[in-house]
Every structure is written in C-alpha cells, then in structure tokens.
C-alpha cells in the first residue's frame, strides 16, 4: 500500500485512467467490428460508410494514447484493402 500522498493519488488516477482507456479501446473495437461485419456481408457501400465512421475513432485512439500510430495505420490499411477487394 502506498504511504505517500502523491502515490495514493497516482493509484486512484491510474485506476480511473485505466477505466477510461479500456472503454476507449472497446469503442474502437466495436467500430472495427461493424466494418468487418459489413465486409463479411459483402455490402461495399455499407462497409465504406462504416469505415468512414471507424477511421476517425481509430485515429482518436492514437491521439489519446491507447493505440500506437503504426497499429492504427495497419488496421486502417488492412480494412481499406478488404473493402476494395469486395468489388473485385
């Protein structure tokens, strides 16, 4: 158990930030799953629409520090490639 006031504060702060970060990661996953579901159904227009909504969420994850930039870029790139492959 922490004895210093600042250490106690950090424990509380870390717990609250962890909760927020987990919620943010879950939100990103939800949007990505919606895109993947649209891709699986073969509906290119729905996939594009879902992708346009998911892309800013993924980038926001980078800004907020829950995703690495390369991870976000990789996710976006792979989803985009899968959407393009629907019509081909």
Swiss-Prot record:
Which Gene Ontology terms cover its molecular function? Answer: small ribosomal subunit rRNA binding; structural constituent of ribosome
Q: State the GO CC annotations.
A: small ribosomal subunit
Sum up the protein's function in the record's words. Binds directly to 16S ribosomal RNA.
UniProt keyword annotations, A-Z: Ribonucleoprotein, Ribosomal protein, RNA-binding, rRNA-binding
Q: Which PANTHER family does this entry report, sorted A to Z?
A: 30S RIBOSOMAL PROTEIN S20, SMALL RIBOSOMAL SUBUNIT PROTEIN BS20C
Q: What is this protein called?
A: Small ribosomal subunit protein bS20
Give the similarity note.
Belongs to the bacterial ribosomal protein bS20 family.
Where does this protein have coiled-coil stretches?
Answer: none
Species source reads: Rhodospirillum rubrum (strain ATCC 11170 / ATH 1.1.1 / DSM 467 / LMG 4362 / NCIMB 8255 / S1)
Would you say which domain of life the source belongs to? Bacteria
